[in-house]
A protein has these predicted regions:
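Substrate-binding cleft of carbohydrate-active enzyme catalytic domains
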Residues: 152-169, 195-261, 277, 281-306
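Catalytic-core region of carbohydrate-active enzymes that cleave or remodel glycosidic bonds
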Residues: 323-332, 336, 341, 363-437
Length: 578
């Protein structure tokens, strides 16, 4: 029922599955709130938003103000003080010489996760490739957890926080794929890690080629000593050789002839993978998945990258997420869902902490601006983006020229537009060869074979973007403004080749200007929105965090960026002296 003073259109509010579900936040994050509040006649109103913890104790209460008189739209914010469950209420009152009347909204839940749910730099590598050796006869000896451990300092030196591993479980033998996705594997082909399971075990086992369970535990500990969290792949599918196929045949789809149906995503066919049927033994599958998650959590894994969650029932994920949040609130789930917006958003509402996004395919100034505003404001209550520049599945068209400046500018965009971004190994070496023209698959894809890379040789020759990546991640760590999602403002430029935006958190104000043209120098005037920046004087001093240069800028700043110069000059990332 409408309260005595009607309070409507409250934002943020996330309605899903017949109830309000929690707005996403982290400890210390400030959440903007707005509501339409009306009263009959000409009475004046006061309004506030109050935040309560799970014990119904008020922990914050701030006024709401009608910034645009006549709109009846009241705006303000609250700050979440700690991890955990909270709820907020919008209150209004009006006092006249005759009476005092009040109104109060219903309760809107808020959940604050640990910081990594919002903030992080992610790196992906295949352990079997790290430390792999190409022998004199052309064969390749696989890397192991022991050899991959030697790569951890290099990943940490680039400033990454999370190391994501593709599946490390036993790989199926039946219908194993060969190099470049050929249907017939050779004797030395290692198989696709996502075809999980053979006689050595399934999702709860380690591929013996990589080592033992103890080797994995040692690897996780070594990563921690290097400041890295391990993100494990949770791929709910199997090879034809997985133990589940015999123990629980009801977990799979069967054709009319009684054979199990393999996975298909027309026109692609995955003869080496069986999808799961969640409808015939839902509780059994859920309990088994929870057992698997709990096992790896006990081994030190606190982050899971979930493979293709959009091909599984949304209510299944909501069930799993709710249970895990109660048991282990430190555990984070990233949705690898490159699919329709409604499904991606539903997965976020169901409980996924983060999601892959469309950033990989947003390249123009207009596309980047509109998409960044969407994820920062329209969907941020339930959908946290993680901007990946590439993945083993996606070699974007714009990278296929191999132009180092394009790799640099895309890294700048991904690492400064949102607080979480990711990069797949080889990006820093400018790997770009496509399997076929017009496609986004890598030539000699690491999904199907071991890739031997010469990290030291590339460093000695200066053929690596790693120092620049390290610089970007260091800037991110040093500046709170780049660790928030809901604080981005775009500023007009006179050229579509240059994009400009700002982010502010307290006294930390960062301006970013990027040349989107990797081949030619571009110059333009940037028209800074001084009110949005919170600067009340004409000229302001800035320091470029990429090259240390200090400059004096003004509301209409001419900027020239030449990608032919060192990679730092595909962009300005400047801190404003306040």
């Amino acid at each position: 029922m409408i309260p005595r003073i009607p309070i409507t259109d409250i934002s943020p509010a996330v309605y899903f599955g017949g109830e309000f579900v929690a707005v996403k936040a982290i400890a210390g994050e400030t959440i903007a709130v707005s509501a339409t509040i009306i009263i009959e006649g000409h009475e004046t109103l006061t309004a506030e938003v109050c935040l309560y913890n799970s014990k119904n104790k008020m922990v914050d209460c701030k006024p709401l103000v009608q910034n645009w008189p006549g709109t009846d739209r009241y705006e303000g914010s609250f700050t979440v003080p700690a991890q955990g469950d909270f709820y907020f209420v919008v209150k209004a009152s009006s006092t006249s010489q005759y009476r005092t009347v009040t109104g109060e909204s219903e309760k809107y839940p808020v959940h604050a996760d640990r910081d990594r749910a919002l903030i992080g730099s992610w790196y992906e590598f295949f352990p079997r490739s790290e430390g792999a050796v190409r022998n004199a006869d052309g064969t390749v000896t696989s890397g192991t957890f022991a050899t991959a451990t030697k790569r951890l300092p290099g990943v940490a030196a680039m400033g990454f926080d999370v190391l994501y591993l593709p599946p490390v479980h036993p790989i199926g033998i039946s219908h194993r794929k060969g190099k470049n996705n050929t249907l017939e594997a050779q004797a030395d082909d290692c198989g696709v890690p996502w075809a999980i399971g053979n006689a050595d075990g399934g999702h709860d086992a380690i591929n013996p080629v990589l080592g033992t369970m103890k080797d994995f535990e040692d690897f996780v500990k070594a990563a921690g000593k290097n400041g890295l969290e391990i993100a494990m792949d949770l791929a709910l599918q199997t090879s034809p050789d997985h133990p589940w196929v015999k123990s629980n045949p009801e977990w799979f789809n069967k054709r009319a002839d009684g054979t199990i149906a393999y996975a298909e995503n027309p026109p692609k066919k995955y003869q080496d993978i069986y999808p799961i049927n969640f409808d015939d033994d839902y509780e059994g599958i859920r309990n088994e998945v929870l057992r698997i998650i709990r096992l790896w959590v006990s081994k030190g894994v606190k982050i899971f990258r979930v493979d293709n969650p959009h091909t599984k029932p949304v209510h299944f994920w909501q069930d799993v997420m709710n249970i895990m949040r109660e048991e282990s609130p430190e555990v984070i789930f990233l949705a690898e869902a490159f699919t329709r917006p409604a499904m991606m958003h539903s997965l976020g509402k169901a409980g996924f902490h983060q999601s892959y996004t469309y950033f990989t395919w947003r390249t123009s100034k207009w596309e980047l601006t509109e998409y960044a505003k969407e994820v920062a404001y329209t969907t941020s209550a339930f959908f946290r983006p993680n901007f990946w520049v590439n993945t083993p599945d996606i070699n974007p068209f714009h990278l296929q020229s191999g132009n180092p400046a394009m790799f640099a500018l895309r890294a700048v965009l991904a690492s400064t537009l949102t607080p979480s971004w990711g990069m797949y190994a080889g990006y820093e070496l400018y790997e770009h060869r496509a399997f076929k023209e017009g496609g986004e698959e890598y030539m000699d894809s690491e999904k199907y074979e071991i890739k031997v890379r010469d990290w030291d040789g590339a460093t000695k020759k200066g053929l690596t973007l790693a120092p620049f990546i390290a610089q970007l991640n260091a800037i991110r760590k040093a500046h709170p403004a780049l660790q928030r999602l809901r604080n981005i403002t775009f500023h007009d430029t006179d050229s579509d080749a240059i994009i400009a935006y700002s982010k502010r958190e307290g006294k930390d104000l960062i301006l970013v200007v990027v040349n989107l043209d990797p081949s030619y120098a571009q110059g333009t005037t940037v028209h800074w929105n001084m009110q949005a920046l919170g600067i009340d004087h004409h000229d302001f001093e800035v320091k470029d965090l990429l090259d240390g240069a200090t400059m004096t800028w003004n509301p209409h700043t001419f900027v020239s960026l030449n990608p032919a110069r060192p990679v730092g000059k595909v962009a300005h990332i400047v801190q404003v002296k306040l």
